[in-house]
UniProtKB/Swiss-Prot annotation:
The chain crosses the membrane at residues 7-27, 45-65, 67-87, 90-110, 118-138, 162-182, 212-232, 240-260, 261-281, 288-308. This is Autoinducer 2 import system permease protein LsrD. One of its GO terms (molecular function) is transmembrane transporter activity. It is a multi-pass membrane protein. The gene is lsrD.
């Protein structure tokens, strides 16, 4: 009972995930093939890698909508640096540093200006996206082809397996463990929750707000860089638009996973399960031949239904009290 009270929403998401797979399996038996389930994650798991630190950002009361552009910038930067003759062993760490720098720029602007993070990261979304397009144009890379010619060892990396699991899925699982420990088992994680619940109280309590926010946005930038590296390896080319479609699925996963968009509460495990739930929903709809437009609409409907259901669950005692009062009035009348 205590386990359900503590992880009730996560268990609900896990049950929905199993139900979803079984329902799609009735329409297409391939959905029940364990190899299909494992290897199809490579198509969407990079969204999860970015959604994990984004969960911590949202729990802190902030938001970062620039990560899609950061992915594109890091991807094209990796291609240009490699094109310039820099070894991949050097180009990859440099790309991660660029991602961290993008995150620190976001944090610095938010802390210095005091402007809402949504406005700041909307600006950097265009800044990083424009920079990616500029670099792409200077390198002569076309929109759909991008920069190719990477070593086989690099392009094979994202398509290899470890213990029978695709490498991107293994990296995602490691990220889930890392961010779960950071958020739920460290002082920094407690600071994140406290800042999200009340930044004013956190400031009066002398919590390291600036340092914590810098860490969160930098981690989101690093995760974006890692996602960019995996995507370049998976597709075999570096393009400025690689992260263009990541924004809504990632935020959907965070909210669906149980994070309060206003801050103060959230779950890394919930986000991880929501990533799989949304990802397999898209995969299953494609397998049964559903058009992309309908697929997107159904994803939005799922989010609304689940969020409404969660809201009812959280406030069920208030609903029960209201029903009791209404019955009392009818009885007295």
């Amino acid at each position: 009972m205590n386990l359900y009270r503590r992880y009730g929403w996560e268990l609900t998401l896990a049950a929905l995930l199993v139900l979803e797979i079984l329902l799609f399996g009735l329409s297409n038996s391939r959905m029940l093939d364990i190899n299909v389930l494992l290897f199809s994650t490579s198509d969407f798991i990079c969204i999860g890698i970015v959604a994990l630190p984004l969960t911590m950002v949202i729990v802190s009361g902030g938001i970062d909508i620039s990560f899609g552009s950061t992915i594109g910038l890091c991807a094209i930067f990796l291609g240009i640096v490699f094109q310039a003759g820099v070894p991949m062993s050097v180009a990859i760490p440099l790309t991660v540093l660029i991602g961290a720098l993008c995150g620190l720029i976001n944090a610095g602007l938010i802390l210095y200006t005091g402007v809402n993070p949504l406005v700041i990261t909307l600006g950097t979304l265009y800044l990083f996206g424009g920079s990616a397009l500029l670099l792409s144009g200077l390198s002569g890379a076309t929109g759909y082809e991008g920069i190719g010619g990477f070593p086989a060892a690099f392009t094979d990396f994202a398509n290899q397996t470890l213990f029978g699991l695709p490498i991107p899925l293994v990296i995602f699982m490691l990220c889930v463990l890392l961010f779960w420990l950071l958020m739920h088992r460290t002082h920094s994680g407690r600071h994140v929750f406290l800042i999200g619940q009340s930044s004013r109280v956190a400031r009066y309590s002398a919590l390291p707000i600036a340092r914590t926010l810098c860490m969160l946005y930098a981690m989101t930038g690093v995760a974006s860089a890692i996602a960019a590296i995996l995507l370049v390896s998976y597709f075999g080319s570096a393009r400025s638009d690689l992260g263009a479609s990541f924004l809504m699925p990632a935020i959907t996963a965070v909210v669906l996973g149980g994070a309060n968009i206003y801050g103060g509460s959230g779950s890394i495990l919930g986000t991880a399960l929501a990533v799989l739930l949304v990802g397999y929903l898209q995969q299953g709809l494609q397998m049964i031949g559903t058009p992309n437009q309908i697929s997107s609409a159904l994803s939005g409907a799922l989010l609304i239904l689940v969020v409404v259901g969660r809201s009812i669950s959280l406030h069920r005692h208030l609903i029960y009290e209201w029903l009791q009062r209404r019955r009392s009035r009818k009885a007295s009348a």
